C-alpha cells in the first residue's frame, strides 16, 4: 500500500524543474545517440540482454528529455500541462498516503486484535450512510478502488515490471493473476 503514494510523491520530487535550453537539449540528444549506436552492436547473448536493458533506460531518458524540453507550436502550453500534471501527482500522492495510513490503522485496530478493539472504518461508513444514502457507499468504493490501484501499482513495480510494448506475455499473465487474486473476496 506504500508504492502508489510514494511513487507519486517521488515523481513530483524528481520532476523537471525548468525548461532546458536548446544547447542542453542538443548535448543530451548527442549523448543518447552515441548510447543507442553502442547498444546496437550486438555480440554475445549476455551482451544482447544488457543492450535491451540499455535501450529501455534510453527510452526512459528520451521521455524525460521530452518533458524537460517541450517542442512544437504549443511548447508553453505543453510545459504548463506538465507542471500541473506533476502537481496533481503530489496531491494524489498525499491523499493516497492518508488512505494507506487509514487502511493500516483499520487493519491493526479491527482485524489483528481479537476481539476487535473498535469498528474503525465500518463505523465511519455506517455514519456516512446515515448522513446521506450514497455517501457511505461512495466512500467505500473509493477505499476499495484505492486498494486495487495499490495492488496494481505494487505489482508493476516489483514482481514483473510492465512497460508499454516491452512486457512479455508470461509476465503480463502473472500480473493479471495477482490482480484477480486480490480482487476476489
UniProtKB/Swiss-Prot annotation:
Database matches in InterPro entries: LMBR1-like_membr_prot (IPR006876)
Quaternary context: Homodimer and heterodimers.
Localization, UniProt: Cell membrane
Entry GO terms, CC: plasma membrane
Transmembrane portions of the chain: 90-110, 132-152, 164-184
Similarity comment: Belongs to the Casparian strip membrane proteins (CASP) family.
Source species of the chain: Selaginella moellendorffii
Keywords assigned: Cell membrane, Membrane, Transmembrane, Transmembrane helix
Ranges of the Extracellular topological domain: 111-131, 185
Chief localization: membrane
Pfam family, one: LMBR1
Membrane topology: Multi-pass membrane protein
Protein name: CASP-like protein SELMODRAFT_413556
Keyword Ligase: no
Membrane topology (Cytoplasmic): 1-89, 153-163
